[in-house]
């Protein structure tokens, strides 16, 4: 212990150090300097190497503009793919779409190192979003088939032809703050060669300055216009600790009304993604959804994330003149044209409110007009649905909104490539508000409602409960600011679909109003919250599962008979009353099909619940709701959907390429439930059972009364 202390070893610095290599680049001579000798042979022939061929017809001149809240997506062309994004964006994250809860479980750290410098992060989440739209007219559907034929040839297998675009690789373009673009409907990359040179100046003129400039998130996009891009956030596991109310299902970014992201439940966010394709002004595709951005082209649309205290300006234009997600009575359409079309005199002044209808129009039987609603909002106007054969009485939302900014008398149909093309005006806030005024009730709901209490918020707005003064009954009021929507036209879904379709198992909308610049939708208040609370915190027996399935299938059978596809079936979209009755809600993503438009193609829904044909970009119909219901059954059995521990894009790849998912503990499931599930989770849509067929399945005979659900609600509230 008294030994001599060892001397500390000293380490000298480097000796005879020489800085032999210092690599640089001479911009004047366009040469590298100071390269190691071994590298010279690799670069010696660079100067003599021919430059890559660039087709000038494929380059669109653009003008840099301030950041724009509204950016439109391009139609994916031949080279686009789901795979390109699936390969590159496995770490994209998703947030619960329609949760209105104020609490959220802790979020596992995704690891900052896994995200490149192009990703903007907050609380471990990354947001990507772009939107485009969906073909919904007969001509559009025919054009889509013609385009596939021209791209892939006559002898291509139909299934492969539909999914070929999902087999190539995409690449990524990073868009930074202030570099977003706005554009009206744009042509395909493959169509540019057919345009005259003057058409580029027309495209260039479509870029517009930003209304808002406080957006802070960076976006990284697939430049090959891959059909996949998301405005959602992802947490791989569910954690207890959520309170019980349900949030709107639209796939918008978080709105401005609340605190930071940590205050809300993390659930997969519904995604509305698709393509916008080029058409002349009078032949615009009615499309909605989202596509990915072409490099150096102002294509694509984005919902930008903002600072928690900032604003998320969602001019849903998730705007464009797009997605006919439902049909609008033709008289509504005619009124909108009369009110909002530009004056024939060529004046630039548009009417700022609903114009007085001439006598002939007033006598046309506008029975569903809001101006003939009864004074009591509970007396919702009854609507007699025409059969699918009489769909000529209905106009798509795209056409409806197109009428706001375009009049055939003012804008003659332009020819492709013509330098004299008339540029359509973008729908102004006043025009859109005037159009919406036609389908809502007149008056101010505050005259008969009081005691507004905010119970939650969603991506489109906030939800309050209010008390009806003369009855004391509680109602739910969804308040949505028109100026802060990502796709304003989808607000028509909130009004028209819920107004016109009434069923015991569909959430009832009493009325809707325009209060200032906000759309207020007054609907029944369901105290039981969302089914998600039950599947997350409890375990359901087969009687309870059958009870839920029976109610949902009744609602779906009714909607499908009317030609309505819900497109976002999941536990978040199922609400419960205090006595256990089950109702379907969240119609923001629904779509109408008819004989004229028998299929849809936009990538819509929440990844884990999406049907394979939706992910593969194949035309689909009401069968997609049946697949999603099957996934929801697995959710009720296992507590979460299949692949929920994987990133959404990886899960989508597995859904698209793998056999139908199975229950984790198959031995715990009865054979009758397995048979019921097998009829829904069929990869081939034509072989999938319909809602009407499933209503006759023996499994549903196990269904009990609504009261059998009540113990589950009590159980999760004790967590």
UniProtKB/Swiss-Prot annotation:
Where does the entry say this protein is expressed, by tissue? Predominantly expressed in brain.
Tell me which InterPro entries the record gives.
CRIB_dom (IPR000095), CRIB_dom_sf (IPR036936), Kinase-like_dom_sf (IPR011009), PAK3-like (IPR051931), PAK_BD (IPR033923), Prot_kinase_dom (IPR000719), Protein_kinase_ATP_BS (IPR017441), STKc_PAK5 (IPR028754)
Q: Where is the CRIB domain?
A: 11-24
Its annotated function is as follows:
Serine/threonine protein kinase that plays a role in a variety of different signaling pathways including cytoskeleton regulation, cell migration, proliferation or cell survival. Activation by various effectors including growth factor receptors or active CDC42 and RAC1 results in a conformational change and a subsequent autophosphorylation on several serine and/or threonine residues. Phosphorylates the proto-oncogene RAF1 and stimulates its kinase activity. Promotes cell survival by phosphorylating the BCL2 antagonist of cell death BAD.
Subunit structure, briefly? Interacts tightly with GTP-bound but not GDP-bound CDC42/p21 and RAC1. Interacts with MARK2, leading to inhibit MARK2 independently of kinase activity. Interacts with RHOD and RHOH.
Q: What is this protein called?
A: Serine/threonine-protein kinase PAK 5
What organism does this protein naturally occur in?
Answer: Homo sapiens (Human)
* Gene for this chain: PAK5
Question: Which cellular component terms (GO) are annotated to the entry?
Answer: cytoplasm; cytosol; intracellular membrane-bounded organelle; mitochondrion; nuclear membrane; nucleoplasm; plasma membrane; synapse
Compositionally biased region (Low complexity): 358-373
Q: Which family does it belong to?
A: Belongs to the protein kinase superfamily. STE Ser/Thr protein kinase family. STE20 subfamily.
